[in-house]
Amino acid sequence: MLRVYNTLSRSLEVFEPVEEGRVSIYVCGPTVYDYSHVGHARTYVAFDVIKRYLRLRGYDVVHVQNITDIDDKIINRARDEGRDWREIVDEYTKDYLEALQKLRVLVDVHPRVTEHISEIIDFVQKLIDSGHAYVAPSGSVYFDVDTYPDYGRLSGRLDKKMWSQEEFASEKKNPYDFALWKARKPGEPYWDSPWGPGRPGWHIECSVMSSKYLGRRFDIHGGGTDLIFPHHENERAQSEALFGEKPWVKYWMHTGMLQVRGEKMSKSLKNIVPLRDLFRSYDPLVVRLWLATAHYRTVLQFSDEVLEQAKSNLQRLRGAVQLLKNLAKEVEPEGRLSDWELGVFREMLDARREFYASMDDDFNASGAFAAVMKLTGLVYSQVSAKPTYLLVLRALRLFEEFNRVLGVLDEDLALGAAEVLPVDELLDLIVEVRAKLREQKNYELADYIRSKLSSLGVQLMDQGEKTRWILTRA
């Protein structure tokens, strides 16, 4: 039974989607005014893992992640650099999409705000017509928070003194009302509307795009904890006010923040790490493994030490799979299982049960990865020592199953056992030559071959009279 933590109820709840067999997910994407950084990746990878696990569980999942391509930050950056705002958007959208591809984050729909202006205007007009919003003298439109009695429950801010919105304007009825539509200012991009030229406020866009692609009620709304207030609180208010659906979102899920040396990663502290810079030092799949194997709600520490550990873990995983592929060339189907083989097989099944039990517990990827490493240990300690057809193929299938969630290994694991690539044949030949050198007691040259292969990322494993190789470089 899958249970998830709901920010709204502040408790674990049994996961039951709105529509049986189908899961709808909306994740707040980036405002594209700067390079994507590792803090963004924390959220995107976490929800990619969640989505992949739900698919593994048999759900039909639709994952929407928006792109905010009009915002104060974009306008300010364009003004500071003397560029057209659309150039800023194009540059950083490209960077964002390239980062997702390298991290193997799979998104079904990437809606952009500027492609949904007519829908946003329609949404705002309906809020005005229903008495939940008002037009100010400037032509800006604000949501009247007092018309939504449940405001503050998502964030736990039940005192009105805690509601003050970032943008205070004397034309608002209350300081905590928030902008749905911003009246045009000189030199800024704008669109025509019934209230005059202007552009959308920040919060309205996600309500509009999520409802367009997922419906008036959907399952999971995700983002970082920094978005709970005011962004998600405001989204919830305007959507439930208009649709009358409660809850509008069934499960609110939020990722923990990243820290650097105990401090929050933020632009104000100048400790942001752009992904494009990080990828120069680490394989993007090392970064993915680090992020994918942490519980999504934990506060995550960023350091070279944790990335080096992830690199080592990825090397060990890749090595285990490569070892299994090599072993698959040696083994043949057998008859009756030995007691020893049955015991190892049961340990593999235990690892599988632990993987699912962890993921069913609020997507505890940390616990699930411990099960993956348990299987990895079995491959090195048991299967490689006494390989059999059943154990080798079962282990490969389990890695393929786990990788459907982790997404860090080759996609062709299950079929890879039968493949023999030219590099495999070359390494097999080198190992064979080294074995003959050892038979001739030419240990100096045999050790030289081992040392050179190791420097190239190939580890040799001497087990009795048999030597096998694995790739270790990540």
From Swiss-Prot:
Pfam families registered for this protein in UniProt: DALR_2 (PF09190), tRNA-synt_1e (PF01406)
Motif segment ('KMSKS' region): 264-268
One Gene Ontology term, aspect cellular component: cytoplasm
InterPro entries linked to this entry: Cys-tRNA-ligase, Cys-tRNA-synt_Ia_DALR, Cys-tRNA/MSH_ligase, Rossmann-like_a/b/a_fold, tRNA-synt_1_cat_dom, tRNAsynth_Ia_anticodon-bd
Enzyme class, first EC level, given as a word: ligase
GO biological process, one term: cysteinyl-tRNA aminoacylation
Motif ('HIGH' region): 30-40
Positions of Zn(2+) binding: C28, C206, H231, E235
Broad class of the protein's primary localization: cytoplasm
Cofactor note text: Binds 1 zinc ion per subunit.
Compartments where found: Cytoplasm
This enzyme's EC code(s): 6.1.1.16
Catalytic activity as recorded in UniProt: tRNA(Cys) + L-cysteine + ATP = L-cysteinyl-tRNA(Cys) + AMP + diphosphate
Cofactor(s) listed in the protein's UniProt record: Zn(2+)
Keywords on record: Aminoacyl-tRNA synthetase, ATP-binding, Cytoplasm, Ligase, Metal-binding, Nucleotide-binding, Protein biosynthesis, Zinc
Family: Belongs to the class-I aminoacyl-tRNA synthetase family.
HAMAP family, sorted: Cys_tRNA_synth
Protein name in the entry: Cysteine--tRNA ligase
Organism: Thermofilum pendens (strain DSM 2475 / Hrk 5)
Gene: cysS
